From Swiss-Prot:
Naturally occurring in which organism (per UniProt): Schizosaccharomyces pombe (strain 972 / ATCC 24843)
Keywords annotated in UniProt: Acyltransferase, Cytoplasm, Nucleus, Transferase
Catalytic activity, EC: 2.3.1.-
Protein name (record): Putative lysine N-acyltransferase C17G9.06c
Family recorded in the similarity comment: Belongs to the lysine N-acyltransferase mbtK family.
Entries under SUPFAM superfamilies matching the protein: Acyl-CoA N-acyltransferases (Nat)
Length: 334
């Protein structure tokens, strides 16, 4: 097994010669992870990492192990001789065992760490269930800003989500909405001016915003992200939770269609929404009931079809995934 894995700043070639030995190399840097069956720990051996932060080193090591073992359900324990001298700068949310001199985390917790994938500041408001509480939302992101970025080893490409900027992205929205296969489900074909007005209205709506998906910086998809309580799906989502999220999706660039890509971007947009606000416990969708291909993709990514219901303009499937389901199953596809 051999593929590329990125730290926050550098690409490393990962080689797994056997299940108990993982090697990461980049220029003069070399990281060796060796599994010790007797202690159930991974030993870290470093060379050339003097200029890399301890948190970045540990995250790279954990990431590599979870790439090689994507369904691992046990705690991963890293044994590193230098960890005691570095503990003062340790900010990664991992368990530090001072007595044993090791750090540990499980896969479910690891994928809920926002950095390095989230580029925008995540909400840090605490979860509250008080009656008549003021609903506090993160502000909509600045148009054109990168929200999420992650290297995908299976594709050898970088996936990113960018907040829609009308001047920069209107051309893609206009082209994609006028494709017959998109118009069939979205019903938003129209002129340049009509689409400009549509996106301007969206930009002024505090409950929703547009997102452009890119592979290697090439736009391929459009998403609309929304808060469920303020959306038209709310009456059907009872009992809805204050911080439920949802999204609409279309893949407009035909070069980036295919069953090998859908699980990647579908799990990644879900990942982004759960990371964006730790109070979010559910992500919901309402695809048209005859969009069976997309519904099946959602089910394959551990979404549940809860019911069918009628909007004025369509019959829809109510699709749901909880935070626990997402992170306890696979998390984002790699």
């Amino acid at each position: 097994m051999s593929f590329t894995v990125w730290s926050k700043t550098e690409p490393f070639k990962l080689s797994a010669v056997q299940e108990s030995l993982i090697t990461l190399e980049h220029d003069n840097k070399r990281l060796l992870l060796t599994y010790r069956e007797e202690s159930k720990t991974w030993d870290i051996d470093l060379n050339g990492f003097q200029d890399m932060d301890v948190n970045e080193i540990l995250q790279l090591a954990f990431l590599s192990i979870f790439y090689v073992f994507p369904t691992l359900r046990t705690e991963v324990v890293l044994q590193w001789a230098n960890i005691e001298s570095q503990k003062g700068t340790l900010s990664l949310p991992v368990e530090y065992n001072e007595l044993e001199g090791n750090v540990s985390i499980d896969r479910m917790s690891f994928w809920q760490i926002p950095s390095p994938w989230m580029y925008t500041r995540c909400s840090d408001w605490p979860l509250s269930y008080l009656p008549n509480q003021v609903i506090r939302r993160p502000k909509c992101p600045k148009p054109g800003s990168t929200l999420y970025e992650r290297f995908i080893p299976s594709l050898n490409e970088t996936l990113s989500f960018v907040s829609l900027d009308i001047e920069q992205h209107l051309q893609y929205f206009h082209e994609w909405q006028n494709k017959p296969r998109v118009e069939y489900f979205w019903n938003e074909s129209g002129s340049w001016d009509q689409h400009h007005e549509y996106l301007t209205t969206l930009q002024n709506d505090p409950h929703s915003f547009g997102v452009i998906g890119c592979f290697n910086d090439v736009p391929f998809a459009y998403f609309e992200v929304y808060w469920v309580p303020e959306d038209r799906i709310a009456p059907f989502a009872q009992p809805w939770h204050t911080h439920d999220r949802g999204f609409h999706a279309l893949v407009g660039n035909d070069k980036f269609r295919g069953p090998h890509r859908v699980p990647v971007w579908l799990s990644s947009i879900t990942h982004m929404l759960f990371l964006d606000d730790p109070r979010t416990q559910r992500v919901l969708l309402e695809p048209r009931i005859d969009n069976s291909k997309f519904i099946n993709y959602l089910i394959e990514e551990n979404y549940s079809k809860r019911l069918e219901f009628n909007f004025p303009h369509k019959r829809a499937a109510f699709m749901e995934i909880t935070r626990n389901m997402f992170f306890s199953c696979l998390g984002p596809r790699i």
